[in-house]
Amino acid sequence: IESAIADFQPEIIINQITDLKNVDMAANTKVRVEGSKNLIDAAQKYNVKKVIAQSIGFMYEAGEGLATEETPLDLESSGDRKVTVDGVIGLEEETSRMDEYVVLRFGWLYGPGTWYGKDGMIYNQFVDGNVTLSDGVTSFVHLDDAVETSIQALNFDNGIYNVADDEPVKGSDFAEWYKQQLNVDPEINIQPAQPFERGITNDKFKAQGGKLIYSTWKDGMNPIK
């Protein structure tokens, strides 16, 4: 990382590094914590002006209603979720060492190459005929919007911003819509929602002038690619 930054001498860095190919939460947390520390160390050494970091918006504590940026993270969690929360904390604390920084807490990403795109994990469950989903509330954001928002964030004030569309959705409602899009009729097993599956607001993001291409996942997933 340091040699790349030394060579390119960038003014701004957008940190979107993850390690999710094998759904290994420990590996992804290591990247978020250690990778972010190394990145910020190098950024400060070579006078990078601003860092924009990709975080996630579904690690808030349990509660009623949509979570805001002021909602505490789920520090009382356990297992893989606690590992992921620790990674989010590490990423965001390291990023905030910069004089100028923005953290984007994205909702669940969808689009080509994701779980919800063609041949993705969720897509394949529906096609194969056996679906298991939680009835919790999900806030989505399209991959294209994640890219676009990262550019918009160049002009955001320092801080943390939830980034998701305007239509949080329960798992049961999503499943009914998604199966109709695919014209399939799988066996759908809806699990009870977890208290932390609550979705997120995007008011703070909009107050900075943030705009999405897809204000609802129904537009972004039609058709499913």
Feature-to-residue mapping (PLM):
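Alpha-helical substrate-binding/gating segment
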Residues: 121-163
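Conserved Rossmann-fold NAD(P)-dependent oxidoreductase catalytic core, especially the SDR/UDP-sugar
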Residues: 34-83
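NAD(P)-dependent short-chain dehydrogenase/reductase
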Residues: 82, 94-138
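SDR active-site strand-loop-helix element
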Residues: 13-17, 51-57, 104-106
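Mid/C-terminal beta-alpha module of Rossmann-like enzyme folds, strongest
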Residues: 147-196
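NAD(P)H-binding glycine-rich loop region in Rossmannoid oxidoreductase-like domains
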Residues: 1-38
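Short-chain dehydrogenase/reductase
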Residues: 29-33, 66-92, 136-140, 168
